[in-house]
Amino acid sequence: MKLLKILLFLLILPTQNLFSSPYLMDPMPNKKPAPDFVLVGIDGKEHSLTELRGKFALINFWATWCTPCKAEMPTLESIHNTLKNDDFTVVGIHVGPGPDAINNYLSLNPVTFPIFIDMDLEYDWGVPGLPTTFLVSPKGEMLYRAVGKRDFS
């Protein structure tokens, strides 16, 4: 019986993406304001959501220990390089161990978008798991959310 359960699991596992959203990101049911924050970036300076007002912000919650997060990073860098201007930015919010782990990872996998360090903001934002990405409007409203690895390129 145990073998049968394992075989069923292995047969179903490859189809899990068939039941996920057909869209890159899912619309938020109500465009509530994104919770504000003041976080320290890997640049050592404090940053807030308020300073991103006036532009679309793709905010990605990730961690260096999260394999899907690391696989997603090059696509975030790609969309950042394609769309970066006064109206759009990508921000990475690292959840978990501090600057040393982040800097070690980024030394081998550099990105040009800002990375902020968080210890508990994911609860305010309703992050169910990593990676989770939000698209925030220029007015600070949460428009879309993607849970799990995506290809943003």
Q: Model regions: which residues?
A:
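Sec-dependent signal peptide recognition
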Residues: K2-F9
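Cleavable N-terminal signal peptides
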Residues: L7, L18-F19
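N-terminal "domain-start" segment that seeds a small globular fold
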Residues: S20-L49
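Conserved redox-active cysteine motifs that mediate thiol-disulfide chemistry
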Residues: R53, F61-S78
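Alpha/beta-hydrolase fold active-site loops
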Residues: F56-A57, F88
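Short, internal strand/loop/helix patches
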Residues: V91, N103-K139
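Non-catalytic, surface beta->alpha helical segment in thiol-disulfide oxidoreductase systems
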Residues: P138-S153
